Amino acid sequence: MRTFEYRVYPNRAQRQQLMACLSESRSIYNEMLAALQAQYEADGTFPSKYDLNMRFKGRGGEHVPATTVQMLSDRLSKALKRALQLKDLGLPVGFPRFKAANRWHSIQLRQYAPSRDVWMDADRKHLHVPAKLGRLLKIKLHRPLVGTPVTAHLVLRADNHWYALIVCETLPQDEQGIVHAEQVACDHPPIGLDVGLKVFLADSEGDTVENPRHYRRGQKRLAHAQRTLCRRKKGSHRRRKVAREVACKHLKIARQRRHHHFTVAKHYAERYSRICVEDLNVVGMARNHHLAKSIHDASWSAFLVILTDKAERAGHGVIRVPARFTTQKCRRCGEHVQKSLSVRTHLCPHCGLVEDRDVHAAKNILQTGLTEVQAGAPPSGTGQDAAPEELRSPRL
């Protein structure tokens, strides 16, 4: 599954219809959650998705399409199921929350097909949606759709612009003309990557990618806007205006970071047959409060997900190796050389090897990854894109 995001341009009347649907769908979702909680408190059971659909049938009125109401029950059921799964794993998790206006930004449309909920017009410049949402929305297809569209979301971002997120079901890789990694291994060399904070990553060929530090670069302007937000009276028009400015700054940082991830991932995914990376416990590493902000700013996990997906589409593979001792172990003699984070050069007292710390770790990762491949371990991968994420806005 792949998700394609396109900008839509509703006129004034259509924007009012979309905002009305957004507000009313949030109210219906909260009513569903209240009914779910009431039944659980009464007899200790949860209503099924079918029960919620039947109970709220026709609740959409003149603002919310019927299929969108059905998707609300599906959304609540998935949230509850995920919460119960995390609880079974012993993780601290709460009950699904009631949604405030600043935590509700999307409208889900169920079926993408002609004469259904949503489909593309023949001119490729307009998107057909239900009449309650404006019927015909202007859209800009800056890139072609790949695969078979299945469903769609209309999302209001923090920049106050509407976007259409079209989820497509892609064909198997072989049917798209993509070959397996074993068939292209002779044409593209393998490589090891070591992600870090001083540099975003270093590879086993000695090259490094600078860490852009998008959040830290924009932190001063963001802090100024947040202080201004704190001085505004809650509920006032001036506070809402500054809150939108803060949200736009966060959105810009997120987009800059994501663009950087895609650029770097594409470079390595297209040029190397096997990409060896560390299997990092990012959650545990972020518990170090001296490094947590920098780790989240680099967003290694998001980068590795993008890298894995792009490598799969190029017919290549990503191999995750244990992160233990990749920095401390000397790649030439195998002895352990203890060093703190402040030591940026690997200097082995046993064999005399001197090398940049990050490049040395990348070469260790490559050696370990190739050893696992020879032992028969398959390359790791995701195979699917994550669901569209909603960016949070400050509380108004």
Over which residues does each language-model region extend?
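Nucleic-acid substrate recognition interfaces
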Residues: 1-396
